[in-house]
Amino acid sequence: EAQLQQSGAELVRPGTSVKISCKAAGYTFTNYWIGWVKERPGHGLEWIGDIYPGGGFTNYNDNLKGKATLTADTSSSTAYIQLSSLTSEDSAIYHCARGIYYNSSPYFDSWGQGTTLTVSS
């Protein structure tokens, strides 16, 4: 059974950056994509991007203009998202998810518990 364990809640200042981790277990890390999704009340779910650890390939939501950088460490089966130049609009719950692509669209079948990010001075 696939399991994704995310790092804990973060409280950071505006203008700084943060790195959230997602450790995978129970499956071959390099055989699936890891996607990242932003959840904000009143805004639903927003796909940020995804990474294929087996080759380091990445896809990003063009609307986010370089807000996020996705990386993966195959030695520890851990994926990371770094968010930069943080503002209050970045306050949200961030989820990682295991995915596959079908007909050029990602499908996620296992989700992390979510990491709450609060950006406040």
From Swiss-Prot:
One of its GO terms (molecular function) is antigen binding. This is Ig heavy chain V region MPC 11. The keyword DNA-binding does not apply. SUPFAM superfamilies: Immunoglobulin. It comes from the Eukaryota. InterPro entries: Ig-like_dom, Ig-like_dom_sf, Ig-like_fold, Ig_sub, Ig_V-set, IgHV. CDD domains: IgV_H. GO terms for biological process: immunoglobulin mediated immune response. GO terms for cellular component: extracellular region; immunoglobulin complex. The keyword Transcription regulation does not apply. SMART domains: IG (SM00409), IGv (SM00406). Keywords: Adaptive immunity, Immunity, Immunoglobulin. Transmembrane segments: none annotated. Residues 1-112 form the Ig-like domain. The lineage of its organism: Eukaryota, Metazoa, Chordata, Craniata, Vertebrata. Pfam families: V-set. This sequence was translated from an mRNA isolated from a myeloma that secretes IgG2b.
